[in-house]
Each structure stands twice: as C-alpha cells, then as structure tokens.
Amino acid sequence: MKMTNRKDIEQVLWNACDSFRGKIDSSRYKDYILSMLFVKYLSDVSKERREEYTKQYDGDMRRVERAMSRERFAMDEQSTFDYLYANRNDAEIGQKINVALNHIEEHNSGKLRNVFRAIDFNSQVDFGEPKEKNATLRNLLEDFNGLDLRPSQLGSADIIGDAYEYMIAMFASDAGKKGGEFFTPSQVSELVASLVQSKENDRIYDPTCGSGGLLLKAYKKVPSGKVAIYGQELNAQTWALCTMNMFLHGVDDARIWQGDTLSNPQNVEDDNLMKFQVVVANPPFSLDKWDSGFLSEAEADSKGKKKMSAELDQYHRFDWGVPPTSKGDYAFVLHMLSSLDAENGRMAVVLPHGVLFRGASEGKIRRQLVEMNLLDAVIGLPANLFYGTGIPACILVFKKNRTCRDVLFIDASGDGNFEKGKNQNILRDSDITRIVNSYQARQNEDKYSYVASFDEIKENDFNLNIPRYVDTFEEEELVDIDEVQRNIATIEAELAEVQAQMKGYLKELGL
C-alpha cells in the first residue's frame, strides 16, 4: 500500500480549496479546510488504534474500550470522519458536522475546549442556501475521503503537522497584510529560535503566538521534546489554529491561552507573572490603542480624556515607562522582559526599526533597557520578508544576568544576505547560519557586524539605529575626468563621421 506523503496531503488541501474558491474568501474557508484536516487526522488515528487493540485483545471490546480511554484523545462514532462521509448526502450535513465538532470538544475538554467555537459548517452567510451549502460540504468530504492519515501510512510523524503549517503559510501569503497577523515566515522563525537556543527543561513562551509556528521552531531545537510550551493569542480563530497545530505536532501539553496579552495576561501564577527561560515573539508592529484594555480603570483628565499610566498595571510592567498609545512595540517588550527568568532568561523579539531611534517615552525606555544591561544584540533584517508589509524589521535579543555590557549590532539587510523572491524576499539557510554564527562570535566584521561598548551607545544618546554602528557605505570609484573627456571627443568624432556618411548617401539618393 502506498504511503501518504506531504505532497499527497497538500494536493488534497488544494483540491478542497477549489471547492470553496469563488464562494468564500480564503480568510474564512481556511478555517473550514484546516478543521476538516484535523478531524480526518483524529479519525484515522483513532480508527487504527481501535483496530490494533481489537486484534491485540481478540475482540474483547471491554478491554479495547479501556485501552482507547487511555489514548491521546477520545472520539465517539458520530464524531468520526467516516460517519460524516457516510452522511455526506444528508440534507442536514452541516449540522451533523457541527455536532461532531462539539462532541470532539466535549470528549477532549482538557485539550480542545472551544477550539471549534468560531466554526459553523451550517453558516448561511458563508455557504449560502441549503442546496449550495450541501453541495460544497459534500465536495469537501469527498476531497478528504481518499486521504489516509493513519500513523502507519505516514512516512514520518512530522508530515501531517508540516503539511498543516504549509497550508497556513499559503493562506497567510494569500491574505497579504492580514496573513502577517497569524503567521511568521518560517525562515524568520528559524532564525529567532536559533538565537535563543532552547534547552531541556526550559519553559518557552510566546505572548503573541499566532498559529504557533515560532513556538514550534523553538520546541524542535530540543530533540527530546523535554520543554514546556506556553503561548497567548488574541484572535479566537487564530488561537484555534495554534491549538490544532500544537496537537498535530504532538505537543499535546502545550498551554495556549486566548485573550489580550497586555491588558489580560494569562501567564499568571499566584498573582504574579510566570517566568520563562525562553521568550520569543513577532508582535503586531506599532499596535495602535494597545492600552485600551486598561482605560476603563483610568481617571479622565480635565478634557475628559483617559490616559494610560504605570499604576494601572498590577504587574508593574510599565514602571520603566509607558509606551505611546499609538505604538505598542515597547509594551510587548516590557511584558516579555517581565516574564523572563532572572537567572537564565533569553529573549528574541521581531520589531520595526522605529524602536531603535524613536524619542519621547520610547527613548527613555530604550535607555533604561541598555543601562540595566538587558540588551544583548540588535539585528537588522532585509526588507520585504513579512506578509503584507515591505518595511524592514529588526530582531532585538535580550538576556538576563549578562556578564558584559557591550551590545552586538548586525546589519543583515544588504544585497547578498537574502534571496529576492517574486512577492517576498527570503532568508536562505546560509543567511541564517551567518547571522547566528556572527551573534555567537560577537566580533567586528567589516560592513556586517560591530560590538559597541556601553560608552559608545551612551555617546549616541542611546540611539540604536544600526547605521550608527555598522558602516555599510560603499565608496564610489573615482572618476578620471581626463579619460571621460577623451572618450567624449572620440565619440563626437565617430558621430561626425557617421553623419557625413549619411549626408553622402542622401545626396546619392537625391534627397
């Protein structure tokens, strides 16, 4: 029997997309397709395990059921893909799918509670009238029916999870700017994970985890898998994608919370923020009104306007300064630092370049981060790496308990440090390796990296703009004016000769 490979899964997913194209926007139908893939995977795994136990216990169903109750997840018959496929022509198939999803949640409430709450396979808004809806859902079930996702038929344990992430990436690309809200390009995630280097027994946290790709990259740096994964995501649909993504990669014990990380952080133990050895994030760039969740407790000024203050945050994250309402970059940075382990905390965050040089409250915060010896490196990335925005970004690396006071600056934005793509630029493996090696070596490299002392940064008034430290200026070749004039004279002589010839030809023609 032919093994199922990643291309097989991707082809089925693309066929499923065809069932929706022209009817629903991809930002919506991605949730239906990825949810159905999840159901098919759970069903096939459950079916194979049941078959194995039935054979092992000679058909003793009591022992089979006892063994099944100890599996990763539970499914009843009416929740399985096979049941749904058998009822694909039912006039109420949309409702049957909804009921199946509800049962899966109920039977696995510890791991999958609310994961399908934003999905409605009976939606008239998305699917139209019953006849159209039933035809679309029938096609969707038929698309997935030929896909065998039993573990014994998958070439490796990572195939299903990798295919799921591939489709998330494709949907993110199609969604443009919106795609950047739930997916970080794989190469950027790989770079961030390589910079923080997760170790066994680390607790890893992403406060704006999107669909979970960055967390998974950090997780995979530890072959034994002996790490604890935590994340929080504001968008309910994206939170569901992340929860399923973790499950498909075998990270069943990941704790992924849903809610506003800034105004309602869930990483709380005994009324204090939890601490993590590794914190990574690609938060929304320059988030406007980031403080809106705090303002209900704020007092209005004489003009009736409410303003954020450090006292409104019970976790004291903004004691070093309150970022401007219109730019939430440092709000996320301060939250991450407040969640970082004091002994061995490592942190890498993707941010717009404005955080390096903007003034006012951001300048004061930046100064304190350097003075407190928390900033370890500033890495400039090429432009156009991210979905929906061409602006260049940087990675700030922070460490607790640093023994030196210098800061490494790397400018990896220039030509030769990336591959130019049709719609997006791409970091190649060699580009990532060069950045990581340079970060670990902490040495000066002409037009690429520079180790700046604290005094140098202080002299620059704590402005961290990379060109102040890494000189990438290419001197233009000196122009030999005499040679240029000689070339002009030669060209003019040749032109005069050609013009004379042309006049002769015209005269011969009587023109």
Locate each region found by the language model.
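Gly-rich Lys/Arg/Thr-decorated short loops/hinges at beta-loop-alpha junctions or inter-strand turns
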Residues: 170-173, 225, 311-318
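Soluble or luminal CAZymes and related metallo-dependent hydrolases
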Residues: 8, 234, 328
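A conserved structural/catalytic subdomain of Rossmann-like adenosyl-cofactor enzymes
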Residues: 2-4, 273-511
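Alpha-helix N-cap/helix-initiation motif
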Residues: 2, 135-139, 178-181, 227, ...
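Active-site catalytic pocket residues across diverse enzymes, especially alpha/beta-hydrolases
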Residues: 46, 222, 340
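Conserved S-adenosyl-L-methionine
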Residues: 178-281, 285-297, 301-302, 351-354, ...
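Non-catalytic, mostly N-terminal accessory regions of nucleic-acid modification and defense proteins
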Residues: 1-196, 200, 255-266, 270, ...
